[in-house]
Regions:
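Short helix/loop segments within enzyme catalytic domains
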Residues: 1-18, 101-162, 170, 178-189
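Post-HEXXH active-site segment of zinc metalloproteases
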Residues: 75-105, 142-145
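Solvent-exposed loop/turn segments at secondary-structure junctions
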Residues: 30-32, 48-51, 69, 76-78, ...
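Peri-catalytic and regulatory segments of divalent metal-dependent proteins
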Residues: 1-81, 129, 133-134, 153, ...
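DG-centered beta-turn motif at the end of beta-strands
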Residues: 65-66, 123, 165
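Catalytic-site beta-strand/loop segments enriched in glycine and acidic/polar residues
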Residues: 60-71, 99-113
Length: 189
């Protein structure tokens, strides 16, 4: 339901010149993770939703973040177009061709570098805008990161070293609220 409400907003924001075939997969795993690939194939792990007890608004924050990675083609811009990372910090990489099609998920998975801090910040900002346009409360993006902090016990695993600290992300989102809250109020259902 959240995903379906966000797809038209993401399509309107698509500046790639290529229509996306948005697809959401739910993966059974305790991991705190979600990811997207060029072209709009996405996954959210059940652990993300269940362990953090995410509301619809918070799920929209996660989906918006990942949609923005796809819309800005971050994984294509990463090393050889082969990188795929998740919001929760776990890395999931697959052989992604330049056309954005996933080739051989499963045994062909490999780990490479996560997105840059700049790309993560772009995905946070774009995701907050997308969720507001879809009528979801942007303040929920803050609560997702607060829940991530609690789930991680306030520490961040080494793999997150290229990601902005959760508190830095929270502050950046907080600074965006004057811009995005009116958009949310205009679109909320």
């Amino acid at each position: 339901q959240v995903f379906n409400r966000m797809v038209p907003v993401a399509n309107a924001d698509n500046r790639t010149g290529i229509p996306f075939d948005w697809q959401m997969n739910v993966l059974r795993s305790d991991e705190l993770n979600a990811w997207a690939m060029p072209g709009g194939k996405m996954a959210v792990y059940t652990g993300m939703v269940e362990r953090l007890q995410l509301t619809d608004d918070e799920i929209a924050a996660v989906i918006g973040h990942e949609m923005t990675h796809a819309l800005l083609e971050h994984s294509k811009k990463a090393i050889g177009g082969q990188v795929l990372t998740g919001l929760g910090g776990s890395i999931l990489a697959g052989a992604v061709g330049l056309d954005g099609n996933l080739v051989g998920v499963g045994t062909d998975l490999l780990a490479t570098k996560p997105f840059s801090r700049h790309q993560e910040s772009e995905a946070d900002a774009g995701g907050v805008r997308l969720m507001a346009q879809a009528g979801y409360n942007p303040q929920a993006a803050i609560s997702v990161w607060e829940k991530m902090n609690r789930a991680q016990g306030g520490s961040q695993v080494a793999i997150l070293s290229t990601h902005p600290a959760n508190n830095t992300r929270i502050e950046a989102i907080r600074r965006m609220l004057p811009e995005v809250m009116p958009i949310y109020h205009q679109n909320k259902r």
